[in-house]
């Protein structure tokens, strides 16, 4: 099950705003998040007057440890992000904050490459965050946060939120629509991979 939530304040004009109502909406839809302060802490963003913000939630029928083993790999995002064709770590070791990676995008998208910095990698709270700091693309000042939360029903709830500058010639709604599609596809791919891995592990244990 996947849901997209875009707070109205995130696409309005004016000074920088915070969007804590995003978390309230998440907690209403997914009660397990109301018991997890990580969601409120990491998915409250400051949004500038020429920026937009959105978030996507994905439920995955797999243990949080299985999902995290894929998500935490800053050096291998193409494992589930199928719009990426390659990734090279160009600074640091890819496993510590401050590491840099350069990713190359598949043809057909309005981008060629992106240089990204690892801002958060928290194995205890299951949080990873990165910022785009360069490259050949139109998504300037893109910042993403992904958190994983245990769910008694599905196994894992993944929340991915982002803030990004609106490119010249585009509206905030158009920008969010475009990025939401990419994030949604990534999380659906992540769900498929994690669920297949979990099923294989369960099958091996039953032998």
Swiss-Prot record:
According to the UniProt entry, the coiled-coil residues are none
The UniProt entry lists the main location of this chain as cytoplasm
Please give the residue ranges the record annotates as the region START-like: 45-195
State the span of motif (Gate loop). Answer: 107-111
Segments spanning the bilayer are none
Looking at the UniProt record, the site noted as Involved in ABA binding sits at 179
What are the protein's GO molecular function terms? Answer: abscisic acid binding; protein homodimerization activity; protein phosphatase inhibitor activity; signaling receptor activity; ubiquitin-like protein ligase binding
Protein name stated in the entry: Abscisic acid receptor PYL4
Write the gene name. PYL4
């Amino acid at each position: 099950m996947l849901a997209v939530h875009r707070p109205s304040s995130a696409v309005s004009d004016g000074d920088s705003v915070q969007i804590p109502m995003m978390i309230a909406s998440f907690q209403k839809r997914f009660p397990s998040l109301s018991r997890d302060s990580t969601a409120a802490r990491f998915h409250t963003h400051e949004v500038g007057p020429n920026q937009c913000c959105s978030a996507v939630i994905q439920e995955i029928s797999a243990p949080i440890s299985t999902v995290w083993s894929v998500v935490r790999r800053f050096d291998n995002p193409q494992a589930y992000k199928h719009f990426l064709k390659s990734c090279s770590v160009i600074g640091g070791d890819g496993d510590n904050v401050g590491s840099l990676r350069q990713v190359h995008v598949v043809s057909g998208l309005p981008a060629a490459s992106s240089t990204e910095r690892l801002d958060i990698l928290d194995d205890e709270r299951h949080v990873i965050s990165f910022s785009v700091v360069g490259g050949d693309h139109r998504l300037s000042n893109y910042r993403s946060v992904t958190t994983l939360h245990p769910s008694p029903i599905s196994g894992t709830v993944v929340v991915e939120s982002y803030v990004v500058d609106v490119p010249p010639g585009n509206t905030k709604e158009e920008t969010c629509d475009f990025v939401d599609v990419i994030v949604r596809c990534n999380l659906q791919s992540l769900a498929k991979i994690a669920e297949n891995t979990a099923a294989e592990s369960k099958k091996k244990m039953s032998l």
